[in-house]
Amino acid sequence: MNEILIPISNKEFKEKVTIRFNSINDGFNNYNNKTIEGTEEAFISFLQEAFELNGAENSYVDFYYNVLNDEDKKKLKELINDEDKILLEKFEKNYHEKNIYFKLTKESIPFITRLSTREILFSTIYFTKYPCTIWGNYNKSFPIFYHDNNDIQQYLNIKNELQFF
């Protein structure tokens, strides 16, 4: 794996991502939404399929590890498995700035999802070809915010095709 996540500027993020908000309540108040529930494995598969649907060029994530203080980083490392520690070490070697916005990579999806579903570090995933924002995680449920019913149908089709939600 070359890059776990690919950093982007706040400016680029705001230009590309139209469904963004500061609090979950803002999302519920200002956007159409549906919630999907399932196992960690189901979410990983769902997000990988959604990534394929949108393409790498239309897939983003906020990942707040770089803004954690040293004590919180240490606690996080104590909570993750060996596989995720290796990924985190690769991330740390490459990214030292306080950036939180990244292009999502397919390889990072299991890592990001495990951190969210295990309530270690929450991330929000943004897709822009079929615009939606997936806020995670609330007791293994992920609210999906969207503008257009045709867009959300793409994601509901993925969920239904996976058959293990």
Enumerate the language-model features and the residues they cover.
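Structured alpha/beta or helical-core interaction and ligand-binding surfaces enriched in interleaved
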Residues: 1-141, 147-165
